[in-house]
Amino acid sequence: LRKRSYAARFQWFEENADQFDDLYDKLVKLRHEIATTLGYKNFVELGYLRMGRSDYGPDEVSNFRKQIVDHVVPIVTRLLEQKKAILGLDHLYVYDGINFKEGDPKPKGSPEELVKGAQKMYHELSKETGEFFDIMVNEELMDLVNRDGKRPGGFCTSFPKYDRPYIFSNFNGTDHDITVLTHEAGHAFQYYSSRNQPLVSYLWPTMEAAEIHSMSMEFFTWPWMEQFFKEETDRFKYKHIAGSLSFLPYGACVDHFQHWVYENPEATPKDRKNKWLELESIYLPNRDYDDIEFPKSGGIWQGQLHIYQMPFYYIDYTLAQICAFQFWIKSEENREQAWSDYNRLCRAGGSLPFTGLVELAGLKLPFDDGCLESVVEKVSNWLDSVDVSSL
């Protein structure tokens, strides 16, 4: 069933492959033309400027990607071997996305009970988060439950005129429901905290900095996960950490691919698919698509909307994840100091560029040599300490 579902998805992509190739080819060439008309060598530099990356460039990101290959890919390979044992499989294919034989953890309670539990959690976390979440509940600033005709997805937006954030999602009875109440609430809390910044452009930071608040809130709320997951709490935490770490190589692969694409705007669709397969062998060496032809031939990236719609917006998630891991590590050592640093970061909004915000929060820059290695070593040690047979 897993294989048939995965194959059915990419059957649609295969049937429309020529249209996707043509569309992306036009986008790449148009973006290249815009960049060269403005005096840039190619779209890479312009793409960075459009993302507001005024304090780092492709060289720093390239170094970061290299660290992921050196220090994260081997750990993910080990986690996949462990997953194979957990599931009792002789071989893992890309469609073997389940994490536990018994299924993934599920939150206990109705949507109303989950929100009530979150309200209690945020009051216990801090005075500021308690006040913030009361406003979200009392002013009905969250549309959380799935219903017929509702658009998919989840996000946080804002109403600057009223100094209020807004959370949208589709609860579906999975652990993702709790992630909404932590991840999107992290975005919303940052906006609430920075609402008094003097400029509208300072209310939100750039994309990679914005994800620090959301991903870090996922970890700051860990002490309360038992009230949502009961006996499945350890399973939830393991999935959370392992999944966050395992995402890093894919995120880096998408970024590396986009750099190559815009540095080689005359490449053909076939060239791009071959390049994806080459990069996949570096960042995701354990992927096996079985006999599903479209992803096997290098087309899987066409299912990633960011690549079409928001060029260079993807490495942001990986940079923020390393910062969030640092907050998790700090909170395990000195929770009060970690929360103080996080609060200071949220209040700053977008008044500083990414590197300035990271330094303000007392974190190490993910680009810097040694940062990623030291962070993932602690994450790996935590994963190694878990008795996965008991999950």
Predicted regions and their residues:
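Short, charge-rich amphipathic alpha-helices with coiled-coil/heptad character
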Residues: L1-Y6
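Contiguous, non-catalytic segments that form substrate-binding/exosite surfaces or channel walls
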Residues: F10-Y166, K364
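C-terminal, non-catalytic "cap/extension" segments appended to globular domains
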Residues: V145, L181, F189, S216-F219, ...
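Extracellular zinc-dependent metalloprotease catalytic-domain scaffold
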Residues: K161, F171-N172
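Short alpha-helical catalytic segment bearing the HExxH-like zincin motif
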Residues: H176-E184
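Catalytic Zn2+-binding segment of zinc metalloproteases
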Residues: G186-V200, F220
